[in-house]
Regions:
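A short, N-terminal "cap"/entry segment at the start of jelly-roll beta-barrel domains
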Residues: 2-6, 18-61, 72, 104-109, ...
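Sec-dependent N-terminal signal peptides
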Residues: 5-13
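A generic "binding-loop/recognition-motif" signal
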Residues: 58, 67, 78, 119-120, ...
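Short hydrophobic/aromatic-rich beta-strand segments that constitute the beta-sheet cores
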Residues: 60-62, 92-94, 133
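Histidine-centered metal-chelating micro-motifs
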Residues: 70-72, 91, 111-113, 117-123
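Glycine- and acidic-residue-biased ligand/ion/polar-headgroup-sensing regions
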Residues: 78-91, 95-96
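Short acidic-glycine-tyrosine-enriched beta hairpin
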Residues: 97-117
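Ligand-binding loop in jelly-roll beta-barrel domains
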Residues: 109, 117-143
Length: 160
């Protein structure tokens, strides 16, 4: 009898954890084969940044930016970056100098952004709803398992 009660309780606890914002996004599945519905996972994510898969040469994170929030002006000298907008409206700016952004485009659902190594860039949520994106870095940019619940938490770690 008690075993049955314990199993039911365990089932409900696991269900509750998986139904939390973003589903169990705290886990990084890297270094193991993994298959995922990337759109569903990205749209459900409510954290500013969560590393979902970190391998030796590649990393995938999901991000959620509140209206008016931005990723922050940054540059990666050691690798390229790919960003896909799953949901929302954003402005993308890029340039070889942080003082001279020569690339300025508006993007929305289903758009892809390719950022070459050495380019300063920023993504700004210009919509009135959260911007949901996934990001692929080659090589990895963040430590495996990185989780930034808010942009302020990310700024404290990265300075942007």
């Amino acid at each position: 009898m008690w075993k049955k009660v314990a199993m039911v309780a365990l089932f409900f606890m696991i269900s509750a954890l998986l139904s939390m914002p973003g589903g169990a996004v705290e886990k990084d599945y890297g270094k193991h084969p993994w298959v995922v519905n990337i759109e569903d996972m990205t749209v459900k994510n409510e954290y500013f940044r969560a590393a979902k898969w970190t391998g030796q040469y590649l990393q995938m994170t999901v991000m959620s930016l509140k209206p008016g929030e931005e990723i922050g002006l940054e540059k990666h000298d050691q690798g390229d970056q790919f960003i896909r907008v799953e949901k929302g409206n954003a402005r993308v700016v890029m340039g070889l100098s942080k003082d001279k952004m020569t690339f300025d485009k508006k993007v929305s659902d289903d758009w892809a952004i390719f950022i070459p190594s050495g380019f300063w860039h920023n993504i700004i949520n210009e919509g009135d709803k959260p911007l949901k994106v996934y990001v692929i870095y080659a090589p990895p940019e963040h430590p495996a398992g990185t989780l930034h619940r808010t942009s302020k938490e990310s700024e404290a770690v990265h300075g942007h």
